[in-house]
Amino acid sequence: MATEKSVTPTEEQLEILEYNFCKVNKHPDPTTLCLIAAETGLSEEQTLKWFKQRLAEWRKSEGLPSECGSVRD
């Protein structure tokens, strides 16, 4: 498995990612993730990694365990 270099999203990419995280869905399904990746120009893997890290950050800020399952599960 090839590992991708860590890529820091640009300000424009971050705006798209944050908008989708805050206003659309904190748990994007594979199709939505693919669309977000296409919109940002990031790979699906990079986009998924960003969402996972951002979700852990959000959970921490809310006083929730960073690794807990979704209430939707």
Curated annotation (Swiss-Prot):
> Under what name is this protein listed?
Homeodomain-only protein
- Per its UniProt record, what PANTHER family does this chain match? HOMEODOMAIN-ONLY PROTEIN
Q: Where primarily located?
A: nucleus
Question: Any idea where this protein resides?
Answer: Nucleus; Cytoplasm
Q: Which InterPro entries match?
A: HD (IPR001356), Homeodomain-like_sf (IPR009057), HOPX (IPR039162)
CDD domains annotated for this entry?
Answer: homeodomain (cd00086)
Q: Which GO terms describe its cellular component?
A: cytoplasm; nucleus
Q: Which residues bind DNA?
A: 3-62
Q: Which GO terms describe its biological process?
A: cell differentiation; chaperone-mediated protein complex assembly; heart development; negative regulation of cell differentiation; negative regulation of transcription by RNA polymerase II; positive regulation of gap junction assembly; positive regulation of skeletal muscle tissue regeneration; positive regulation of striated muscle cell differentiation
Cited SMART domains: HOX
Describe its function. Atypical homeodomain protein which does not bind DNA and is required to modulate cardiac growth and development. May act via an interaction with SRF, leading to modulate the expression of SRF-dependent cardiac-specific genes and cardiac development. May act as a co-chaperone for HSPA1A and HSPA1B chaperone proteins and assist in chaperone-mediated protein refolding.
Its taxonomic path starts at:
Eukaryota, Metazoa, Chordata, Craniata, Vertebrata
Q: Name one GO molecular function term.
A: histone deacetylase regulator activity
Which UniProt keywords are present, listed alphabetically? Cytoplasm, Developmental protein, Homeobox, Nucleus, Repressor, Transcription, Transcription regulation
